[in-house]
Amino acid sequence: MGVTLDSALNPHKPEGFGEVVAPDPDYFKALQAEVNDKGFLVTSAEELFQWARTGSLWWMTFGLACCAVEMIHVNMPRYDLERFGAAPRASPRQSDVMIVAGTLCNKMAPALRRVYDQMSEPKYVISMGSCANGGGYYHYSYSVVRGCDRIVPVDIYVPGCPPTAEALLYGIMQLQRKIRRIGTLER
């Protein structure tokens, strides 16, 4: 295709950046030996479920303020969140991830808890932005909850005011890594 990865062609590229790293050959040799020996792979059902969960995160929006614009931005073609297996859903019963974005008021807190309770297990929460994380700019207001973690358990915090689409994308990838590492989170 005419693609070269030679660093001499681009003198502005930092050393070690963008280099192609070969996969670990011992891993593939062991995998090939197991398939050749038995004809199939052996794994636990829990590891299989963890792998499947990371590739099919269905999230629901709980956009309360300006952070919701960045949440919409991450679905546009530039970032295309669906290529990571995350797709938006309108119903909490179909979702397993809730992204709380924006200022959570005291009047909205029961609705947040009700939506969280309607989600099926396992369920995960991403708190997006300074207002959702700790009240943000409105922290000292009488009507603002100082962090959505006082209402629902939060798995991933995405900082920023508002956080960029890249930050939310990174937070979702961190949630996928956490699911792979921990499995079904016990609450």
Curated annotation (Swiss-Prot):
Question: How does the protein's chain sit in the membrane according to the entry?
Answer: Peripheral membrane protein
The protein's UniProt keywords, in alphabetical order, are: 4Fe-4S, Cell inner membrane, Cell membrane, Iron, Iron-sulfur, Membrane, Metal-binding, NAD, Quinone, Translocase, Transport, Ubiquinone
* Domain of life of the native organism: Bacteria
Top enzyme class, one word, equals translocase
Q: What is its EC number?
A: 7.1.1.-
Sites binding [4Fe-4S] cluster sit at C66, C67, C131, C161
Q: How is the cofactor bound?
A: Binds 1 [4Fe-4S] cluster.
Query: An example Gene Ontology cellular component term from the record?
Result: plasma membrane
GO MF term set:
4 iron, 4 sulfur cluster binding; iron ion binding; NADH dehydrogenase (ubiquinone) activity; NADH:ubiquinone reductase (non-electrogenic) activity; quinone binding
Record's subcellular location: Cell inner membrane
| Catalytic reactions of this protein | a quinone + NADH + 5 H(+)(in) = a quinol + NAD(+) + 4 H(+)(out)
Q: Briefly state the protein's biological role.
A: NDH-1 shuttles electrons from NADH, via FMN and iron-sulfur (Fe-S) centers, to quinones in the respiratory chain. Couples the redox reaction to proton translocation (for every two electrons transferred, four hydrogen ions are translocated across the cytoplasmic membrane), and thus conserves the redox energy in a proton gradient.
Family in the record? Belongs to the complex I 20 kDa subunit family.
Q: How does it assemble?
A: NDH-1 is composed of 14 different subunits. Subunits NuoB, C, D, E, F, and G constitute the peripheral sector of the complex.
In Swiss-Prot or TrEMBL terms, this protein is called: NADH-quinone oxidoreductase subunit B
Species source reads: Rhizorhabdus wittichii (strain DSM 6014 / CCUG 31198 / JCM 15750 / NBRC 105917 / EY 4224 / RW1) (Sphingomonas wittichii)
